[in-house]
Amino acid sequence: GKKMESLVESYLIKSGYKYQDDYLKESFLIDAIANWNIDVPNLEKMDQSRKRFDFVLRTTNQVYGIETNFYTSSGSKLNETAKSYALLGLQAKDIKGFTFVWITDGKGWKNAKKDLRNAFQSLKTVFNINDLENGIFDQFRNCHGNG
């Protein structure tokens, strides 16, 4: 929950992103792009265009909708989230200039490896705390496509 969001935000800041200029917290995607006056064609193709993301990040070439969570145990919530985010990732592939990112971690994944593997197959932008420590947000600045 909030601890994971705070951790992710600390890495955004560490990578030089500034709140409101470069990223928004708990923001609807369409509100964020309107606020920044960015054109994201075909956004309506994504069922979740009205979705509130934990973070919306913008770089020169890309807008990222970022969801974060940490699972201390496995279960149906983890499974449903994995399926939902995999679908969101598939829809996002058709939207030039937008990438969906899922940052997740926790020991709950130890017993749900199949769900995580399935999510990875359709969503190439699944990251964990180790990826944050290794500067994944620095790489976003240079990204020109959906993952």
Where are these predicted regions, by residue range?
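A short, highly charged nucleic-acid-interacting micro-segment common to nuclease
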Residues: G1-Y17, Q48
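Active-site beta-strand-loop-beta-strand hairpin of nuclease catalytic cores
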Residues: Q48-G65
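Glycine-centered loop/turn motif at secondary-structure junctions
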Residues: G16-K18, K96, L123
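Short, conserved beta-strand edge motifs with alternating hydrophobic and charged residues
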Residues: D22, I66-T68
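Domain-level recognition of nuclease-like catalytic cores that cleave nucleotide substrates
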Residues: W102-G147
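Catalytic cores of nucleic-acid endonucleases
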Residues: T68-K114
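A short acidic/basic microdomain associated with nuclease active sites
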Residues: S15-D47
